Amino acid sequence: MVVKIGILKCGNIGMSPVVDLCLDERADRNDIDVRVLGSGAKMGPEQVEEVAKKMVEEVKPDFIVYIGPNPAAPGPKKAREILSAGGIPTVIIGDAPGIKDKDAMAEEGLGYVLIKCDPMIGARRQFLDPVEMAMFNADVIRVLAGTGALRVVQNAIDDMVFAVEEGKEIPLPKIVITEQKAVDAMDFANPYAKAKAMAAFVMAEKVADIDVKGCFMTKEMEKYIPIVASAHEAIRYAAKLVDEARELEKATDAVSRKPHAGEGKILNKCKLMAKPE
C-alpha cells in the first residue's frame, strides 16, 4: 500500500524545508507518495486559501500536514478553517506562538506539533538579506536536528503513515515539543551531550523572544538592529552546541541513527559500522 501525504507549506519556519525530506531521507521509500503545495514566504489569507483548497479538492491525500509560522495568525487560521471542514485528517506544525491556540485546534479536529525551539527570524530590512536569512535557517535546522525536535516531528508523521497502512484510525498528534521531549527522542548515550543539546534548545527558545523584541517592540533603528543581530549570534552558538553534542557521541561510537527501511519501517543503530535493524 502507498500512503499519499499532502504537505502544505505557507510561510517558513526552520522545520519547513525538511518536513517532507525527513520522511524519506534517501528517496527510496516505497510506501509513501508525497505532494507539496505552498505559498512561498507569504502566508496571507488569500495565498493560504488558494493552496489549502487545492490540496483538499484536487490532491485529496490520505492526510495533510500544514506547516508554517504562528498557527494563530489570520492566514493559518483561514487554512485551519478550510482543512477542518475538508474531512481529511490534518496536523498543524508550527512554532511557539501557536501554543495559545492549541485547544482551539483540537476543537477543530486538527492535530498539532508545536516546536518551541523553532524561533522567529530577525526580520528587519536593515539587517536581514537573503544570505543572512539562509544562514539563520541553516543554524535553526541544525538545532532542530541535533536536539531531537526533528525526530519528534518525523515520528509523529510516521505514526500517521503506519496507521493508514494498518487500516486504523489516524492518530492526530497533540504535541508541544519541549527540550525534554526533544532530547528523549535522540537517545543520547553521553549525559554531557544531552546537556549540551538541552542548552541549545533553550537558547533557541530565547532567540524567539529576542527577535520579537527587535521586530515588534522596539521602534528605533539604532536599537532594534543590534537586538536582532544578537538573536542571530545566539542561534549560531546554539548550532555550535549541538555540533559539540554530536562530537561527544561520535567519540564513543554512540550516535543514534534511525533510518527508514525501503518499506517504511524505522530501523535503529548506534555503532557506525553496524547494520541498522
From Swiss-Prot:
Gene3D superfamilies the record matches: 6.10.140.120, F420-dependent methylenetetrahydromethanopterin dehydrogenase (MTD)
A GO term for molecular function: ferredoxin hydrogenase activity
Domain of life: Archaea
InterPro entries: MTD, MTD_sf
Any Pfam family matching the protein: MTD
Cysteines joined through disulfide linkages: none
Reactions the enzyme catalyzes: 5,10-methylenetetrahydromethanopterin + oxidized coenzyme F420-(gamma-L-Glu)(n) + 2 H(+) = 5,10-methenyl-5,6,7,8-tetrahydromethanopterin + reduced coenzyme F420-(gamma-L-Glu)(n)
EC main group: oxidoreductase
GO biological process annotation, one example: methanogenesis, from carbon dioxide
UniProt EC number: 1.5.98.1
Keywords: Methanogenesis, One-carbon metabolism, Oxidoreductase
Keyword Oxidoreductase: yes
Record pathway: One-carbon metabolism; methanogenesis from CO(2); 5,10-methylene-5,6,7,8-tetrahydromethanopterin from 5,10-methenyl-5,6,7,8-tetrahydromethanopterin (coenzyme F420 route): step 1/1
Entry-linked NCBIfam families: PRK00994.1
Function of the molecule: Catalyzes the reversible reduction of methenyl-H(4)MPT(+) to methylene-H(4)MPT.
Family to which this protein belongs: Belongs to the MTD family.
Protein name: F420-dependent methylenetetrahydromethanopterin dehydrogenase
